[in-house]
């Protein structure tokens, strides 16, 4: 069996990936100009900028922070990269947008980035694969020992609905109000190896799992395991991929700070010989559905005995509990933004409010999202 080496990584470092949709500033439609944008931002020898990259769809670019010790530093890095992208997109009349789904675009109008990897994915997944018109925020946290990675993954599943509800930003799909806060959460899990992770107890179990998938042709390597929360052996991190796309730097910072603090807390518990609290897989699955459906109004299961609480109350209390850790990690201001989201509304709530105030116009929803990304919530 092939062994998966877990790279050395400084403990509790942070890196953030932010996927951005390219939209016509006048119509709000998606525009497939990623190749042109990346070409102008690339290196002199024709390679992509190392921190501004392509994605599955040609209407998307991704900005990727370097590895940082604090969330504020990672956010500043991302904002600088977005500024570079705007130098190319602004003259073209193209705006940047980030929500987990585009409110009215149709999947069959979108062009795929030429890539053997993407061709293989779509050949296998067909209709479901073509539906992946989604944009997200991924947060990596450095793990200092390989054997801590899977307990951290399992522990973070307890807080999955908190992060899903806080970031939920996909109430619309192809012009329809889905009735869900995060339609994306239930769409993405249709892909093979996507969705909730298996709760493995040891690294050897994960290696056996990946080997089984490679042997049977499900994946070519571990990077094609697309769990919502996964170990990333290449970087020596745990990667949180459950969050919907977020349209402001403050919201990205809030979610990243919450993930940073939770992971650091669990690392400390593991140092003390205490495994993070985990929930039964059936509770984890139910929590994912509840957060996707009801967002911040979801009542979620918070303990192995089946105790339930309103997720917004959980988030408010959790933010206070983690405040000392946030101070130590240098992200107190960002973690406090969780309270702001609870007070002013998550993205899905703001989008629904804009649509209602404008006679159901989804073009106005796109306009509000692009304005948020450019100017913040004010």
Swiss-Prot record:
One of its GO terms (biological process) is modified amino acid biosynthetic process. Keywords: ATP-binding, Ligase, Nucleotide-binding. Transmembrane segments: none annotated. It catalyses: L-cysteine + L-glutamate + ATP = gamma-L-glutamyl-L-cysteine + ADP + phosphate + H(+). GO terms for molecular function: ATP binding; glutamate-cysteine ligase activity. SUPFAM superfamilies: Glutamine synthetase/guanido kinase. Its EC number is 6.3.2.2. It is an enzyme of class 6 (ligase). HAMAP family: Glu_cys_ligase_2. Belongs to the glutamate--cysteine ligase type 2 family. YbdK subfamily. PANTHER family: GLUTAMATE--CYSTEINE LIGASE 2-RELATED. ATP-dependent carboxylate-amine ligase which exhibits weak glutamate--cysteine ligase activity. This is Putative glutamate--cysteine ligase 2. It comes from Leifsonia xyli subsp. xyli (strain CTCB07).
